[in-house]
Amino acid sequence: MPLLDGDLEGSGKHSSRKVDSPFGPGSPSKGFFSRGPQPRPPSPMSAPVRPKTSPGSPKTVFPFSYQESPPRSPRRMSFSGIFRSSSKESSPNSNPATSPGGIRFFSRSRKTSGLSSSPSTPTQVTKQHTFPLESYKHEPERLENRIYASSSPPDTGQRFCPSSFQSPTRPPLASPTHYAPSKAAALAAALGPAEAGMLEKLEFEDEVEDSESGVYMRFMRSHKCYDIVPTSSKLVVFDTTLQVKKAFFALVANGVRAAPLWESKKQSFVGMLTITDFINILHRYYKSPMVQIYELEEHKIETWRELYLQETFKPLVNISPDASLLDAVYSLIKNKIHRLPVIDPISGNALYILTHKRILKFLQLFMSDMPKPAFMKQNLDELGIGTYHNIAFIHPDTPIIKALNIFVERRISALPVVDESGKVVDIYSKFDVINLAAEKTYNNLDITVTQALQHRSQYFEGVVKCNKLEILETIVDRIVRAEVHRLVVANEADSIVGIISLSDILQALILTPAGAKQKETETE
């Protein structure tokens, strides 16, 4: 019986509920009558049709008038229940168009349904629009199998091999590998600019625009600073009105080495308070163990900044979370700083503090997935990485105040401790100086380095050594695993030869291959 177009929607919504009734495969129409009469829910579009049938009459699926107007009859949409799958656990509310089992409904068995319909029936089934084919547009090979399954011969297992399926009137389907590039392109098009940049590391092997030596540079350029920010981390912020002494105690209590400085008057971050500031205060105001360091006890951070910076005031060096890691590495090395705060330019919030160690560890995690440049197999002597001339060092009996003077004058972050025979026995870094604040022993800086190192934390990094004949790949792996900031280059006699730092390694891995671009940036 022809129905209005409005009934087409209503019948489609309830077709899955009707077809799941138990019925024999040889009598499709009888199975629908076994449910008993069910009045249709009222709808504005089906109102003109309702007077033609009584509310208690069953809904006939295959009336004889079906042949008179096949394009207008929505009852052929109930064929989805006749072609039953092998599973009997399908829910009445399940939608074959979206479930994986719906793909097999029309490719299972036309013989088991027991239909004796006219030759035009299969054509009409393929034209029905109950199931939106748009949901399969990401899998074209399965879509073709879905369309021609109703007019294909009985199931021969070809649905599991889309590439072998052939239609008498259509060419064979393409192999699934044919669609792999289109899927990757569709994925890249669907992602935003930030996420699309993350996919660049997967295409390193196909890039021919640059040499293989620039693979790490391209990796850092394709990742943003936000990618390296951990899910959970601690960030301590100091107001410039806080006393210097309390600020350093807070660094020790929270186990951090630096903190951004917030100035309430400007409502912005104006600088960083690091262990270097603590060393500079001790170096500048320490007189003797008998004289208290008044400036450390009473000065506020803003007072110290005014006295120390004076005419050398510089704005805070920071970076946006949307900037590339290549820009972060370049900013760290160019400005000769060890900590780079990541500040959101919109909200003004500080998100994280980038360091050489964090960046190199991030890069090392993905090194195994990237092509290995040739220079990774070269040793330190061939590459010339590190400092091998005029190495600053101290002895075990060197006073702390002298070590602090070397830190300030040479602008270095660590001093190897060498015994009388020339062997490296320990290392005294800037981070060890903060223990003076923890122990409240900064009033007596005449004690020896050995005495000061006795109070060192149990998490001491230790002296990690290497030699000049080790390749760069080994050096990177060792410094990342040891979680240290530098390696002492020693010879066979365990005597100091040089120092290789994190900045030296990042320079060799990232900036040296990108030297031409960095020089252009410097000139600008």
From Swiss-Prot:
Sites binding AMP 1 sit at 272-277, 317, 338-339
Where in the sequence does UniProt note compositional bias of the Basic and acidic residues kind? 135-145
Q: Which positions are annotated as binding AMP 3? A: 338, 387, 392, 413-414, 485, 501-504
What GO MF terms are annotated? Answer: AMP binding; ATP binding; protein kinase binding; protein kinase regulator activity
* A GO BP annotation: fatty acid biosynthetic process
Source organism's superkingdom? Eukaryota
Binding-site list for ATP 2: 257, 339, 357, 429-432, 456, 485-486
What residues bear Phosphothreonine in this entry? 121
Residues where AMP 2 binds: 257, 357, 429-432, 456, 485-486
**InterPro entries given in the database record:** AMPK_gamma/SDS23_families, CBS_dom, CBS_dom_sf
Name used for this protein in its record: 5'-AMP-activated protein kinase subunit gamma-2
Q: Which gene encodes it?
A: PRKAG2
